[in-house]
Amino acid sequence: MNAMGSDYIREVNVVKSARVGYSKMLLGVYAYFIEHKQRNTLIPAGFVAVFNSDESSWHLVEDHRGKTVYDVASGDALFISELGPLPENVTWLSPEGEFQKWNGTAWVKDAEAEKLFRIREAEETKNSLMQVASEHIAPLQDAVDLEIATEEETSLLEAWKKYRVLLNRVDTSTAPDIEWPTNPVRE
């Protein structure tokens, strides 16, 4: 038997009222003394009543569980799974597409971020195409150096070298408005 005169204390799920919502509390012989004094008041939308057993009272706590907010620094979606207020660095508004930044009230296009991305993308493309050109040039150059190249190989070597020079001249800072030279295989 405990101090309250009951050894039948157990945790159960209780619906106090349709207007109060769901809570968990300890019930025993004297559990009827633990009452929600405001059970006839409506709980505002976005809140839930939580019973504090230390204070023997109900408190309203923000409830955004199951909702998605967006980090204003990264635009990443964050799923809310716990009770309590939202972090300060989030918004309900989702970014529309890529290269968005938060201006304090809305998502706006981040032209600078997009430009930097396009330049990096163009540099990667240029490096990849230069590698392909060098791979084609190497065996053709070997054939010429060994004086065993056919006319077709000599012609292809010249075309690939010209392509590589033109490719090297591409200004990636103008991305995405780049006119790439034509690959000799495609001519």
Curated annotation (Swiss-Prot):
Stored Pfam families: Caudo_TAP
Family stated for the protein in its record: In the C-terminal section; belongs to the tfa family.
Additional remark text: Encoded by the cryptic lambdoid prophage DLP12.
Protein name: Protein TfaD
Organism from which the protein derives: Escherichia coli (strain K12)
